[in-house]
């Protein structure tokens, strides 16, 4: 009887431990999933400034290319692809937050005209779903469905990102018009150099905050350095903290100037922006164009037939 009770207690403890572990796993996964904030969303109501500059450039300081491809024209209530290409050398490795080297991630922001939005899953073709893969798109703001963000995602797999877009229908959306519209895109590869609060990441160069002699360099246990700079005139000391990642360029006893680089610049990524144009085409206008072309072709045919008939009449009169 005692053995049975002991077994029952052990069973309850194991069940409880599994339940707690499962809860911790779910909580941890949730926090990890939400630990990739799109920094621009936190600090800016609109990602594109009045000057045309996309705010992602505030954190990603290096300038790199980005390309966007969209159809020249689309019909109302139609799903189409906006393909964003973020090219880079796949052999490159970036400095991670812990100072180690790893693959580059990519991200993009797509600014569509008002009324254009992410296409619902039930409107996507099988081919389009394959192109999208496991990408998860989200609106920049709940009230800004025309601005889409994605990332960070692995660059080796998603250096080309396909956005599924649904065009508006002016018949149901009064604000939509049959016009030519601009589309803006921003894309980054790799980590940024500056955080939104203005502090530096470990993916950038660190400069001396004072002039003097490098009197001491301490290598930290978890990586990084503490560099003590002593002013030769008054012996005042300044300590510069270097996080893990950048390579040190100075040594003890070296004389340095203010703002002189203490480390190399480990950044291999960068940000770029571009634009394209798309026409929301009126179906009646297309039908009118087709009708006009058909009329021209028919007129040409009748003209040729009339000419041949006239030639036959002339030939008959000559023979008569």
Curated annotation (Swiss-Prot):
Membrane topology qualifier: Single-pass membrane protein
Listed cofactors: heme
GO molecular-function terms, A-Z: electron transfer activity; heme binding; iron ion binding
GO cellular component: chloroplast thylakoid membrane
Keyword vocabulary terms for this entry: Chloroplast, Electron transport, Heme, Iron, Membrane, Metal-binding, Photosynthesis, Plastid, Signal, Thylakoid, Transmembrane, Transmembrane helix, Transport
SUPFAM superfamilies: Cytochrome f subunit of the cytochrome b6f complex, transmembrane anchor (SSF103431), Cytochrome f, large domain (SSF49441), Rudiment single hybrid motif (SSF51246)
InterPro entries reported in the protein's UniProt record: Cyt-f_TM, Cyt_f, Cyt_f_lg_dom, Cyt_f_lg_dom_sf, Rudment_hybrid_motif
Intracellular or extracellular location(s): Plastid, Chloroplast thylakoid membrane
Gene Ontology terms describing biological process: photosynthesis
Binding positions for heme per the UniProt entry: 36, 56, 59-60
Listed PANTHER family: CYTOCHROME F, PTHR33288
Family recorded in the similarity comment: Belongs to the cytochrome f family.
Function according to Swiss-Prot or TrEMBL: Component of the cytochrome b6-f complex, which mediates electron transfer between photosystem II (PSII) and photosystem I (PSI), cyclic electron flow around PSI, and state transitions.
Official protein name in the record: Cytochrome f
Species whose genome carries this gene: Ipomoea purpurea (Common morning glory)
């Amino acid at each position: 009887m005692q053995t049975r009770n002991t077994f029952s207690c052990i069973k309850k403890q194991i069940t409880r431990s599994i339940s707690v572990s499962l809860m911790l796993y779910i909580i941890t996964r949730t926090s990890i999933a939400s630990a990739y904030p799109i920094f621009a969303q936190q600090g800016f109501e609109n990602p594109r400034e009045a000057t045309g500059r996309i705010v992602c450039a505030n954190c990603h300081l290096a300038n790199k290319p980005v390309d966007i491809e969209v159809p020249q024209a689309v019909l109302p209530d139609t799903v189409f692809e906006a393909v964003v290409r973020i090219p880079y050398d796949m052999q490159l490795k970036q400095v991670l937050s812990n100072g180690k080297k790893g693959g580059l991630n990519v991200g993009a922001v797509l600014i569509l005209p008002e009324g254009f939005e992410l296409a619902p899953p039930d409107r996507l073709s099988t081919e389009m779903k394959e192109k999208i893969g496991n990408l998860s798109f989200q609106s920049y703001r709940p009230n800004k469905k025309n601005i889409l963000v994605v990332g960070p995602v692995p660059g080796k797999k998603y250096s080309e990102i396909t956005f599924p877009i649904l065009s508006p229908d002016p018949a149901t959306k009064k604000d939509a018009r049959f016009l030519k519209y601009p589309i803006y895109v921003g894309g980054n590869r790799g980590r940024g150099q500056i955080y939104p609060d203005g502090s530096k990441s470990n993916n950038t160069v660190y400069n001396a905050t004072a002039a003097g002699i490098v009197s001491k360099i301490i290598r930290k246990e978890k990586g990084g350095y503490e560099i003590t700079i002593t002013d030769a005139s008054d012996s005042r000391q300044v300590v510069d903290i270097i996080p893990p990642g950048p390579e040190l360029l100075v040594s003890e006893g070296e004389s340095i100037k203010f703002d002189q680089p203490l480390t190399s610049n480990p950044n291999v990524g960068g940000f770029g922006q571009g634009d394209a144009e798309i026409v929301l085409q009126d179906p009646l206008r297309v039908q009118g164009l087709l009708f006009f072309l058909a009329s021209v072709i028919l007129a040409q045919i009748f003209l040729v037939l009339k000419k041949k008939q006239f030639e036959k009449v002339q030939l008959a009169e000559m023979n008569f």
